[in-house]
Amino acid sequence: MTVGGRQLLSSLIGAMILQTGFTSGATVWVWDVDGKLDKMPTVVEGQTPNIYSIVPQIDLKDGFEGQEGKLEDTFVGRAFGWLKVETAGRYRIRLTCDDGATLSINGREVLNTERGTGFVDQNTAELQSERIPFDLKFYENTGKFNLKLEWQKPGDSDFSIVPPSAFLSEAGQTFVVSPGIKRHFLEIDRRAPGDGRPVAGVHPSYRLETFRPENFKPQIGGMCFLPDGRSAICTWDQVGAVYIVEGLNSSSGQVKVKLFAEGLGEPLGIAYLDGDLWVTQKGEITRLRDNDKDGKADQFEAIASGWPASQNYHEFTFNLVPRGNKLYLATSVPLRGGWTYYNPGSEQAFPIPNVPGSILEIEKSTGKWSVFANGLRTPNGMGLGVDGEMFVSDNQGSWLPCSRINHVKRGGFYGHQLAPGPDSTPKPSEMKPELPADPPVVWLPHGEISNSPSEPVLVNEGPFKGQMFFGDVTYGGIQRMNVEKVNGVYQGAAFRFTQGLEAGVNRLAWGPDHKLYIGGIGSNGNWNHQNHRFGLQRLAFTGKSAFEMLSIKVSPTGFRVKFTEPVSRIGASNFEMTSFRYAPREFYGGPKLDVERFLPTGARLLASNEIELTMPLKKGFVYQFRLVDLKSAKGENPWSYEAWYTLNEVPKP
């Protein structure tokens, strides 16, 4: 028996895998916003904060220090965690905030400075001797920011600042931030879901089915189907398991889950090949054999290994894509201290510096591997798509101003710079942002349509046939894109598709029943969607139509926009356009550059559901489309109002 990667488990289960326990302090998220704030705003869902920290107590002044400098005005924040109450009883609680704040304890609002006087509100609350969840939301317009939480304990004669000993936060949090202005709205905002914010719930053309047993809570790292219709999933958790899911289409509706293997190190890809399940774990492809046919793997055969796989929490091995006689997987870069480093453990064991952040090609018969493409950061999602080509997602970070979907080709370079120095520690001066990168198929503006894109899959039937779906771990839901090839380069448009799922989406797979199976995942901190961390569901197409943009394709003089249904009166004024570009930098993420807002210069109706828009075109720019005052011929509002087209090439007339 070849143990292979199972020996890695104790040392390589990364820090991002779900931990339990508490640490001292209150967790604080802060979003940079613009415009005048005179009431408590709501930050649009799906946007990561600009600043993320754990503070000892709520006595905060003058703003917050962040990656982009100090944030002093026009921001929205949230402090949350648990209050550790040592003495039960009746407490007086006082909240001070310039400009406004609310405090909820145990899910009930107890303080609101906007209904108090002089930026202060106080109230009485009965607190039990236990850990009590709290959520403190605040905002700052201009002036000197001040936020303070005080209490008067039973028997005290006056208020005092709630001490550090009374605050608890989740231990082992993953701190995910991003730069730039974040979107917000007020209760009086008339914009609908799907217009400047995520769509509301499940797509109208699909039915959501939750079929997992209630006590089965998988954090799914990979998913595939066996020839007999059963599903195999691997889990990114402390078990490191492979499960077989049976009865997916039984008339009784009783789904059964059986453990097939365990002890794998961060399994994040799985495929059924040559009669066995093959799994990608950290630093290895492992073939799982059930020689005695008892329903459990008894042989773990290392098929391929040897690429860097350090203990670094961010050095993953993702995916397992069979293509002909080759296998393809992706590796991410390790992170440390705010910079990206190549640091494969305590010794320089691997002489190849460009393997982290690469697509690897593996000979299936020999296990020999080589670098197929590189310049990636966190390529958590790869699959076969349009024209049978491979596409891979990548996540915003250093050198990636926002997330993107890339066309995978031999020798491709996708932008992430990694240049080790003589001691294997790259220095900022050695990182060369001028190194040209292959353009993405689509840029995915952060917090607007995606934060952490995952696995793409080709759609083979239904209204979106020929397009691609892809999931998202922290923005949540599934998005879609139409792709076209212009002058030999792939490019296209990204659209919001669905929300309403039980967790952020890590893996997608079409079942033999023609349903889309959805694997959820999540971890500590804000590396999750709405604090949900597991999920297994599926979407079934109902045949019902929903009014929305079906596709956007470029023309020599503009774009052709096609809808799923005939439209009512339509013209150039129904489209608000914004164009912008991105540029790499060594810091996390990046702003939109050269932003212009405009209306199309002309419009021509091509069919009852298609229009051609005329406008100036600039290669290397993203074009955002926003529908305004547009309804279908039946009087229906759009399901989603926005789309983003990445223009790499302009077709010849």
Model-identified regions with their sequence ranges:
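Bacterial N-terminal signal peptides that target proteins for export
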Residues: M1-L12
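Bacterial N-terminal signal peptides
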Residues: S10-T20
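Extracellular/secretory pathway-exposed regions associated with glycan biology
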Residues: G21-R92, T96-V202, E209
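Structural beta-strand segments of beta-rich domains
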Residues: G89-Y91, T557-V561
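Extended, polar beta-sheet/loop recognition surfaces of beta-rich domains
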Residues: R92, S632-P653
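Surface-exposed, short loops/turns at beta-strand junctions within beta-sandwich domains
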Residues: Q128, P616-V622
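Beta-propeller domains with acidic blade repeats across secreted/periplasmic ectodomains
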Residues: Q173-S551, S555-G558, R569
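Short, surface-exposed alpha-helix to beta-strand junction/turn motifs within ectodomains of secreted
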Residues: V561-G602, F625-A633, Y641-Y645
